[in-house]
Amino acid sequence: MERIVLKADLILHGRELDSMEKGSIVIENGRILDILPQHALADFPITDACELSFPGQTLMPGMIECHNHLCIDATLPEHLELLAWSNECQLTILALKGLEEDLLSGVTTARCLGDKYYIDTTMKKLIEDGKATGPRLLAAGTGMKGSHGAGYIGSPHCGTEEIRNTCRQNLKRGVDLLKLFVTPGVPDPTSSFVPSFLSLEEISMAVSE
């Protein structure tokens, strides 16, 4: 059993990034076991731990990725075009690989802003049940764009009732947030005009849901 204790003058932790002065992080076999004040280490049952001190430094145990799509791996050639022909099985394999890589890179929470086939909500449940490896996920389910909208991830919608239906299907799947693709992902740099592919009524419907 490998245990490492990291000590720093300040540690930010938890969902609200609470601050702890003179804190310590106890890691066991590559996983964070506990976060506690350094003075409490004497009462913590750890032996033969490797201690690393970072005086004058701040540690945040786990980075938060605020925007991702599990079905996209930007390291692959023509990664966006892959979405057009990849099936659910292929995208699931891609998501599992990416989730493990994210966790190993230091990401412990990721916000997924739309994925095909509800892969994000499926992965979230598998991770929570200990059946898959990855960071804690906040899932959006099916992203909604206009029927003439841009992008590869969002599902085309036309009218408030289609928006309402998808919102409710997403909520039934246990999403944490709803994602609207309102404007182009990459606006035209030569124009000051930014089009909206969803109407005010469609956006208002999603907000009301």
Region spans (language model):
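Active-site mouth loops of central-metabolism enzymes
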Residues: L80-I93, H148-N165
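Divalent metal-dependent hydrolysis catalytic cores, especially in the metallo-beta-lactamase
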Residues: L94-I119, G134-K145, V175-P189
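Short amphipathic alpha-helices and their capping/turn segments at secondary-structure boundaries
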Residues: D48-M60, D120-K131, T160-V175
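Conserved beta-strand scaffold positions in the cores of enzyme catalytic domains, especially
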Residues: V5, A49-S53, A139
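N-terminal metal-binding scaffold of metallo-dependent hydrolase/deaminase domains
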Residues: M1-P45, L59
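Divalent metal-coordination and catalytic microenvironments
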Residues: D9, I25, G30, G56, ...
